[in-house]
A protein has these predicted regions:
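Positively charged, low-complexity intrinsically disordered leader regions
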Residues: 1-54, 58
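Phosphate/diphosphate ligand-binding glycine-rich loop within oxidoreductases
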Residues: 34-141, 268-271
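Glycine-rich phosphate/diphosphate-binding loop of Rossmann-like nucleotide-binding domains
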Residues: 47-59, 142-223
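A short helix->loop->beta-strand "cap" motif at the edges of active sites that frequently abuts
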Residues: 117, 175-177, 253-259
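Rossmann-like adenosine-cofactor binding region
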Residues: 197-274, 279-280
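Adenosine-phosphate binding glycine-rich loop
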Residues: 257-258, 263-317
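Single conserved hydrophobic/aromatic residue that forms the stacking wall/gate
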Residues: 318-330
């Protein structure tokens, strides 16, 4: 049984096969409409979510399946003290696959060790968000035609930004990429992302606080919000909030074919005057999210693509490498 706990739970070839499956489903959804008849997805969301939870539910419904779950720990037995381990054991009796979001890093990994069905990490604290990473890869490939030999700028909250950590890990598997990490000193990329993702594959990366200086040299810009919910000190959050604000005037410095991605929600880091610029790709990401999550569900359930007769994952293999940082923080 396979789980999707972090991007590298799937090999690079499996990730590419997943992207290809999502492309086929977007182009021709009809053959996939009943592949999950009689199957149930459980969405266990201990933190607030709009896009991730609704797109997972939409994905399962579009495959012919059903959903159940909760949105908020206060609506579950977690409010009574039930552990993640027990919840995973219990819900395994009700569902065929679980998507879990949790504020504590490592919680979905822990759940996967006790569940009897596949577990998808739908975001665990500041650690990882692998399904969002697949959405980001799909969007970049659509816009740039490749996932290698790109200069990718990440801007904003790189310390707590789990989407940044996950996408960095995934893009590190592709040749010739260069990473530019743009943030205030207090929100720099965590050391473990460098030691686990960048350094083993000898990736070239730089760190800076100057977005304007880097814009002319980027192939892709990935913006993130400053995440208030990760701060213990309100004063520190207010000091850093608004440190980067991309608007149409600043975007004139960037290449004409540089897509702007954002995992959403945005606060004030991207002005609404950017929305009508053809480089704005963040609502493309939302659109792609349903098809990627449909593909993830089919892959984990081992359901063959009716157009190719093949499955995405090798279900004979064990779970791939899981980050040491994720383990140690549980």
């Amino acid at each position: 049984m396979r789980h999707f706990i972090e991007p590298n739970s799937f090999s690079r070839n499996e990730q590419l096969a997943l992207l290809d499956l999502a492309d086929r489903m977007e182009a021709n959804p009809a053959p996939y409409a009943h592949l999950c008849d009689g199957r149930i997805l459980a969405t266990l969301f201990y933190e607030p979510s709009t896009r991730t939870r609704l797109s997972f539910e939409s994905a399962m419904l579009r495959l012919g399946g059903k959903t159940l779950g909760f949105a908020g720990a206060q609506l579950s037995s977690a409010s009574k003290g039930e552990t993640v381990e027990d919840t995973a054991r219990v819900v395994s009796n009700y569902a065929d696959v679980i998507a879990m979001r949790h504020p504590k890093e490592g919680a979905p990994l822990r759940a996967s060790q006790y569940a009897r069905v596949p577990v998808i990490n739908a975001g665990d604290g500041g650690h990882a968000h692998p399904s969002q990473t697949m959405i980001d890869l799909m969007t970049i490939r659509q816009r740039k035609g490749r996932l290698d030999h790109l200069t990718i700028g990440f801007c904003g909250d790189l310390k707590f930004g789990r989407t940044v950590h996950s996408l960095t890990a995934a893009l590190s598997q592709f040749e010739g990429n260069r990473f530019v990490f743009i943030s205030p000193e207090d929100l720099r990329l965590p050391r473990y992302v460098k030691t686990e993702s960048l350094e083993p594959t000898h990736q070239v990366y730089t760190e800076t606080d100057d977005l304007e200086a880097e814009l002319p040299h980027l192939d892709v810009l990935y913006m993130t919000r400053i995440q208030q919910e990760r701060f213990f000190n309100e004063e520190e959050y207010l000091r850093l909030k608004g440190c980067y604000q991309l608007d149409e005037a600043m975007l004139r410095l960037a290449p004409a074919d540089m897509p702007v991605l954002h995992p959403l929600p945005r606060i004030d880091e991207i002005s609404t005057d950017v929305d009508n610029d053809p480089r704005a790709a963040y609502f493309d990401q939302v659109h792609n999210g349903v098809y990627i999550r449909m593909a993830i569900i089919l892959a984990l359930l081992g359901i063959p693509d009716p157009l190719t007769g093949k499955t995405v994952l090798d279900h004979r293999s064990e779970e791939r490498r899981v980050g040491k940082e994720c383990r140690s923080r549980w």
